[in-house]
């Protein structure tokens, strides 16, 4: 060999063979690697399917949670519309909703991250899917070759089926002929049964006719006997007629005796008597003979009819005998035909047995051929099933990828939708929070105005009391009546909380009817007079909400002063001097301008204020008097642009404090003057006689200094009661020196 004929000392043939073998080895390794990766890909797909199912379940759970939160939020909105004072609950629910929104946002971010990961995996799977499409093309070519083979097998099976159908057609023809023979045989049997039944019917008819014949024969014998008797009677009558010919001459002489003859013709027993007297009964005998002739004629007619009937019976008897003979001949012919058909049936059954044997032999031959063909077909079907499994697996993968892509799109849409909903709910929560804040501000302003108005009311009531004591002292300066010098007691700052006072104003719709505090005698309000009454305490216990429950309510805010205290005592916590000393001028803030002045004259007492001027809020639907509506409208106009309705004010803000304990008055009052109802308050003249002065009943009741509740101040909450009970000690009951004397008229 030449040195240039082979590279590096190896011949070219070995190099080419090694290259070809290496190429095939690389192809084999690549194919095995692809099969392994496809199996790993299936496992990954299962894992991804499990992960997706878990994510979908989590999504469903989140949707359920979100629906529950949405329902709670809707219920919260309804409750907020129904209860204007439940703002703290809305704040807590808004915080919970914000927390849930934060959780949902976190979960959405996690889901977005998972979606990105799944999109990357989808891209990888698409690249793998393109490779699988190439494999599918190769598989489709193999499927076409297998389909050609299956077509050839189907043609062979069709030929076998054609031969099988021919045998089936021959078998069906034989079965049809046999069925026709069976039908003819059954018809003949039915006709035979019918003929036998007809023969039985005819036999019954013949027996009946024989009975009729016997009866007719008996009647014939009886008729013959009757005829013989009649003939004998006729003979006797003829003999007597011959004897009567001799006495014809005597008939003319005895015409006068006709009346006697009519009486003697009723019975045949008198015939002998007429014969003994021929001249008298000759005519009657002739008449009797005529009657006998007529009866004989009738008997002859009956005899002729009987003869006719007998002849007809003989004719029917002959016809029946002929019909019975015909039926017997038909029965014999039918029996011969039946034997002929039975012989034919036996022949056909023998033919059928032979044909079935031939059919079974042909069937066995065809069955053997079919078994061989089915084996070949099963082998080819196994190959086709493997290919179909590959195709179905690939199609399932395609469908799963498409479904996943659709689920991802839907999931993105739901995420955007819920993000929009979360933004809307956040806006609603912010709006609710701002509305609650504005409502709280309005409530605080209204509380201040209410306290100021109540202070005015206390001053007016104090003036009314003084006017009741001294009806002619009308011009009384305002500065002469300090809180410490008032007969109603000390400053309202030292009163107990609004929860322990008797309510002057009517309660709200949520609170129920008016109730009095059990801690004070006779309710402890302005209208209480005299010592306490134990049944009042029992009446207050009938309420569903007791004063103890209200005192221990943790949702109420603390108050620095009672609801009747002026606004400067609510806004500023000041140190007040002990009772008996005057207030410094520098400590008092400037007073507000009076915003509520009533057109009242002298009132007969605080009880009338409570009974006439304070209508119940439970009757706000038209039962409020016009004077009160005008006064309420005036107060609303003076309160500015506040849009909080009067019914939303808590009932405890409209209650009077128990600090104003008036001195007990006379149990029997004097006559009252006529009532003037033109103003918002009831106008009356001065009472007659005037009550005794207040100094007669002893000194004013003492009070204890206020005590602040330890701890930080609590935020106000818009409930039925705005203020929490303070830690004040209750007042001691009034100690009258003696009861006043009854006025005399």
Swiss-Prot record:
Keyword Phosphoprotein recorded: yes
Q: Where in the cell is it found?
A: Membrane
Q: What keywords appear on the UniProt entry?
A: Coiled coil, Membrane, Phosphoprotein, Transmembrane, Transmembrane helix
Instruction: Spell out the InterPro entries in the cross-references.
Output: cTAGE_MIA/OTOR
Query: GO cellular component annotations, sorted alphabetically?
Result: endoplasmic reticulum exit site; endoplasmic reticulum membrane
Q: Identify the gene encoding this protein.
A: CTAGE1
Give GO terms for biological process: endoplasmic reticulum to Golgi vesicle-mediated transport; protein secretion; vesicle cargo loading
Main subcellular location of this protein, as a coarse class: membrane
Record keyword Thylakoid present: no
Q: Which residues form a coiled coil?
A: 84-254, 290-411
Q: Which residues cross the membrane?
A: 13-30
The record's comment on protein family reads: Belongs to the cTAGE family.
Topology within the bilayer: Single-pass membrane protein
Designated name of the protein: cTAGE family member 2
Q: Where is this region: Disordered?
A: 508-589, 611-654
Cysteines paired by S-S bonds: none
Residue stretches of biased makeup (Low complexity)? 512-521
Name the residue ranges with Basic and acidic residues bias: 538-558
Query: Which residues are reported to carry the modification Phosphoserine?
Result: 267
Which tissues and organs express this gene's product? Answer: Testis. Not found in tumor.
